[in-house]
């Protein structure tokens, strides 16, 4: 499960990394948590990219109430195509979620120990994400979830799940 991450890169680095046409307005943070508005990169019809801020905790479009609904922060890659909460977003509304690292907690004899997982060079990368629009009468909510998968051998001692990471050469395919 991915429940905390960080994005500390500069606006300029994000523009360059994701080949954006406009400057990005966001607050760098070492502790991004569910229910916060987070930076997402979406691809437009002309294959250019732009950033949007979405609430982290996907509310399905068919949900009756945005406040009492489950806010789904993660979607399992193994079931994302079939689950009613995610299947439409998986087909039509994918996004990239910029990050510099994420946190996982491993159980040990003293309770839990936090690990910060990041690239060795500390550079940006992107989580695979889904976004959704929930609408009811005059209220509209845009929200997202991070897709997770089984942990790699390197990650397995810390946690059995990890975010799906998309490499830059696959951004357009995602």
Model feature map: region roles:
Residues 1-174:
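Short linear sequence motif anchored by a di-proline
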């Amino acid at each position: 499960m991915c429940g905390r991450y960080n994005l500390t890169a500069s606006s300029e680095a994000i523009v360059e990394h994701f080949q954006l046409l406009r400057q990005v307005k966001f607050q760098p943070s070492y502790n991004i948590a569910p229910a916060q508005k987070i930076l997402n990169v979406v691809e437009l019809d002309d294959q250019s990219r732009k950033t949007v801020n979405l609430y982290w905790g996907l509310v399905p479009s068919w949900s009756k109430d945005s406040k009492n609904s489950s806010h789904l922060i993660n979607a399992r890659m193994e079931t994302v195509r079939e689950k009613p909460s995610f299947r439409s977003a998986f087909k039509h509304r994918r996004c990239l979620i910029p990050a510099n690292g994420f946190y996982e907690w491993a159980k040990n004899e003293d309770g839990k120990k936090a690990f910060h997982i990041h690239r060795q060079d500390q550079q940006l990368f992107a989580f695979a994400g889904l976004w959704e629009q929930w609408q009811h009468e005059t209220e509209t909510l845009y929200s997202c979830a991070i897709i997770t998968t089984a942990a790699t051998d390197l990650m397995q001692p810390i946690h059995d799940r990890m975010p799906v990471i998309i490499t830059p050469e696959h951004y357009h395919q995602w």
